[in-house]
C-alpha cells in the first residue's frame, strides 16, 4: 500500500490501464459480494416464507456475508486493494492512501457491481424484490445511525490494521479473512436492528432494483463517517511517524 499522500491524481491516471484494471476488479468483487450477501437473504425468505426471523437465520446471513467478502477481497486485493465498499474507499481517501480520481473510479465500479448483482438476483429468483436495508420497527433512527458509524469504524480499523498499515508484516496474509470476520461479527450485533450494512454499495443496488428508499441515507452517511473516523484515528494516532533524518558531522575523537 502506498505511503500517505493527499492528491487529486495524475493527469494520466484517469486513462491508465492500471486504473481500468483496478476498477474492473472492484466491479467484479462487489458483484460477487452483493450477489451472495443479498442472495442469501432472498434464499432465507424463500425457505422460511412468513416465519419470524430466527437466530439461525441471523447466523446464516452473517456467515454468508463473511465468506462472500473473504472471497471478494481475496480476489481483488492484489489488483485494487480489495475495497469492495465505497466507505472503505472513502476511508482510504481521507487517510491519503488513494487519489480522488482512483476513489471516484472505485465508487462508480462498486455501485455498478451492486446494481448488476441486484438485477441478476431479481432475474434468477423469478422477480423477487431485493429487500435492501431498513431500520426495524421500534428502533430509533438516531440509534441506528450511531450503530452504522460504530460498525463501519470497526471494519475500517480492521482494514487499516491488516491491509494498509506499512508495518502490518505477515498479518497482511490474513487481511481478507479478518475483514470478512469483522463484517460477520457486526452482522450478529446489528442484524436484528438495521441489517448491519456498513457498505453503501450493498444498500444501493438492492434499494434501486427493489425501489425501497426509506431511511436509505443512514446506510450512506453512517458508513462514510465511520470509515473516515477510523482512517483519521489510525493514520494519526496509531501509525508511527518516522522521525526526519538528521544530517550532522560526527564528532571528532577528541570531542568525546
From Swiss-Prot:
Post-translational modification: Phosphorylated by a tonoplast-bound calcium-dependent protein kinase.
Motif NPA 1 mapped to chain: 85-87
GO biological process, one term: seed maturation
Tissue specificity note: Found in all seed tissues that are alive at seed maturity, but not in tissues that lose viability during seed maturation.
Compartments it resides in: Vacuole membrane
Residue ranges of the motif NPA 2: 199-201
Bridged cysteine pairs (disulfide): none
Molecular function per GO: water channel activity
Keyword field: Membrane, Phosphoprotein, Repeat, Transmembrane, Transmembrane helix, Transport, Vacuole
Gene3D superfamilies from the UniProt entry: Glycerol uptake facilitator protein (1.20.1080.10)
GO cellular component, one term: vacuolar membrane
Vacuolar topology ranges: 45-57, 122-143, 190-216
Listed NCBIfam families: MIP (TIGR00861)
Domain notes: Aquaporins contain two tandem repeats each containing three membrane-spanning domains and a pore-forming loop with the signature motif Asn-Pro-Ala (NPA).
Name recorded for this polypeptide: Probable aquaporin TIP-type alpha
Upper lineage: Eukaryota, Viridiplantae, Streptophyta, Embryophyta, Tracheophyta
